[in-house]
Amino acid sequence: MKGGSPRFCIPMPPVLVVEAVEWLLMECAYFRDDLCSSCPSIETAYTAQVQVKQEHARALLANYPQLQWLDPVTSAEAGFRNKAKLVVGGSAKNPTLGIVDYRTGTSTDLGECPLYMEPIQAAIPVLRELIQRADLTPYDIPNRRGELKNILVTASAAGELMVRFVLRSKKLMVPIRRQMDWLQEQLPNLAVLSVNLLREPVARVEGDEEIILSERQTLPMQVNDLTLHLRPQSFFQTNTKVAEAMYAQGREWVREVAPRSLWDLYCGVGGFALHAASVMDGGSVTGIEISAEAVASAQRTVAEYRLEGVDFSAQDAPEFAVSSGTVPQMLVVNPPRRGIGESLCAWVEGSGIDRVVYSSCNAVTLAKDLERMPSYAPVQGRVLDMFPHTDHYEVMVLLQKQ
């Protein structure tokens, strides 16, 4: 690697390990040179990474001897990430797209990070040139000067792109608009283009105000046999292939239970709810999500498929459940890392719902939530490696009322 380009990861030659098993290790120059620490396990054999995550999940849920663990869902080791959060640094003439030290303002270009899907990798040089052409001044964090803070890029499985410019103000909107035709020529797969305003000097990726510049307002995301719609501020899992397996597993559990009614709390753009509806044969499905943009995305999918009995609402999930006065026959929860918390756990514990699907991106809070619901026990579980080369993973459990 010495003397060559340090801006990419290459596989090391296969090495022989015990029992003649070949492991393909990855070496990342960004990681090696202490430029990026986002993938602390990247130099660990992938099979070993998955094994560690399985053991971690099993240890946390060791108090449930009846829990049957299904085979883990693994990921591609590179080219799997469908979203790039690119902090813009440097200058308009020589911009960097990658990460930044918020204390010093020092930026590191990660333009050749191999985790990104190919359409994102191909778009980064174009976006760098756009900054130069339009003279878009990067935001200087320590001095609180400049305009362009971040560029957020999302890719669909079909290769289409959503590109969002996160700005300090509307000052750069005119030069961005002037370059739209050029950008579309360079990126014919560009589906959605928007500006997001983050006026405050805070360490956030995006603000609350979005201005869509393109004619199209949603990025279609093909997931299994469904097309989900993604609006600019809607959350979507960063690993599409593993998300497909996650939703398919949820759908299979719903198929086995065959409920007449189901709630999907923290539903996002409706992945679990819409997959469940496809096997419920006319039952009612309700999706609850705090993000109005995500709910609008889910409602677009409902309208497109002309689904009946499927409703989405922008509400706080625990507040909705506690105040609803009714209970579904089956429940799906897919909370953020903090888990579903005490109030929702208490409601579930007293609800009498027979089966609950709990999909968690933090097995530690999952274990704590299960302790708060002693009348429910996990009967099946599955680890899904949504985030290769990190300590994070998704784990799903099917809970049964005891």
For each predicted feature, which ranges?
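Nucleotide donor/acceptor-binding cores
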Residues: 82, 161, 259-260
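Short, aliphatic-rich beta-strand segments
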Residues: 89, 153, 159-168, 227-231
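Extended interfacial segments that mediate partner engagement and assembly in macromolecular machines
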Residues: 25, 37-144, 156-158, 170
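Feature of Fe-S/electron-transfer and energy-metabolism proteins
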Residues: 77-81, 148-150, 263, 269
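Disulfide-bonded cysteines in secreted/extracellular proteins and peptides
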Residues: 28, 36-39, 113, 267-270, ...
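Short, intrinsically disordered, charge-biased short linear motifs at domain edges
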Residues: 23-30
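Rossmann-like S-adenosyl-L-methionine
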Residues: 2-15, 20-22, 172-177, 181-402
